[in-house]
Regions:
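Structural detector for short beta-strands of small beta-barrel domains
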Residues: 1-9
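Walker A/P-loop
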Residues: 167, 172, 177
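SH3/SH3-like beta-barrel fold
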Residues: 13-17, 25, 46
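Helix-rich effector regions associated with P-loop NTPase G domains
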Residues: 11, 29, 35-52, 62-78, ...
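Phosphate-binding glycine-rich loops and their immediate beta-loop-alpha structural context
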Residues: 86-135
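Short, Lys/Arg- and Gly-enriched loop/turn segments at beta-strand edges
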Residues: 51-61, 89-91
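Short, structured beta-strand/loop micro-motifs enriched in basic residues and often containing a Trp
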Residues: 21-30
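Canonical P-loop GTPase G-domain recognition
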Residues: 117-169
Length: 299
């Protein structure tokens, strides 16, 4: 029987099987022997030991398509990144850092700008101009007014989505709306675990209940703590340009091969930024991250 690990705690792994619910499982010793640790999000083959009590063993961890470190989770299909249009105003450098992280992992990103009900039209237009031109899908929502929530639900269907964003942007309110009447906390897990005993924050998949009219193919959200800073240090500065998709049309047009689009003269990317074809906020954030990576190498 195949399922997905939705939570792991105290040596137990809770596996959601779409057709029959959540099973409390232990991992066989062979995984420890091979140095493999099951992760939340892993697709696994389980052996059911007790159907009534929903207990079993994990027999096999299926091949992972990707893996994140923070949060520790595997097999992410997409990321829903939530920022507010206003109150607080978006921290563009922080947003662009997260986009770079997802580009590096080849995880598609959907941008959700919340609190659009209290935002100026000029601010909404600015966000749209910056990020739609980079090729990212952009939604302007209001958790308070329920704007565009149904559209966001549709893009979550059948996917495992990491939900991320800084504190204070209405992420929790958005989750409450996305869950419709109930978002199962991994089925009966909340009854099996005494949460008071576990104060450490663990990665966890929230299982979205599907509309009865829609075939349930497994929709999950990975909620993450609000972040206030992100460091780009998992790659070299020469790779950074490949994580800004809007640079793509200008790669190869620079005078010098291997141009990093920072110091070199006759650079097509710099020229595009000067002409407004690449937004100055995005280009400036690229330069800031490039210099940060340059300093990392120096030390």
């Amino acid at each position: 029987m195949q399922g997905k690990i939705v939570k792991g705690i105290a040596g137990f792994y809770y596996v959601h099987v779409v057709e029959s619910g959540v099973y409390e499982c232990k991992a066989k010793g062979i995984f420890r022997k091979d140095g493999v640790k099951p992760l939340v999000g892993d697709n696994v083959e389980i052996e059911v030991l007790d159907e009534e009590e929903k207990k079993g063993n994990i027999r096999e961890i299926l091949t992972r398509k990707n893996e994140l470190i923070r949060p520790a989770v595997a097999n992410i299909d997409q990321a829903l990144v939530v920022f507010a249009v206003t109150k607080p105003k978006p921290h563009f450098n922080l947003l662009d850092r997260f986009l770079v992280m997802m580009e590096q992992k080849k995880i598609p990103v959907i941008l959700c700008f919340n609190k659009s009900d209290i935002a100026k039209e000029s601010d909404i237009s600015k966000m749209e101009e910056i990020y739609r031109s980079c090729g990212y899908p952009v939604f302007f929502t209001s958790a308070k007014e329920g704007w565009k929530i149904e559209e966001v639900k549709k893009i979550l269907h059948g996917k495992t989505t990491v939900l991320a964003g800084p504190s204070g942007v209405g992420k929790s309110s958005l989750i409450n709306l996305l869950q419709s009447e109930v978002m199962m906390e991994t089925g009966s897990i909340s009854r099996k675990i005494d949460r008071g005993k576990h104060t450490t924050r663990h990665s966890e998949l929230l299982v979205l209940e599907e509309d009865e009219k829609v075939e349930d193919c497994g929709s999950y959200i990975v909620d993450t703590p609000g972040f206030s800073s992100l460091y780009v240090n998992d790659f070299e500065k020469e790779q950074l340009k490949y994580y800004f998709p809007e640079f793509g049309p200008y790669e190869g047009l620079c005078r010098f091969s291997g141009c990093d689009h920072v110091h070199e003269p006759h650079c097509a990317v710099k020229q595009a930024a000067e002409e407004g074809k690449i937004h100055e906020i995005r280009y400036n954030d690229y330069v800031a991250m490039y210099r940060e990576l340059q300093e990392k190498r120096r030390y």
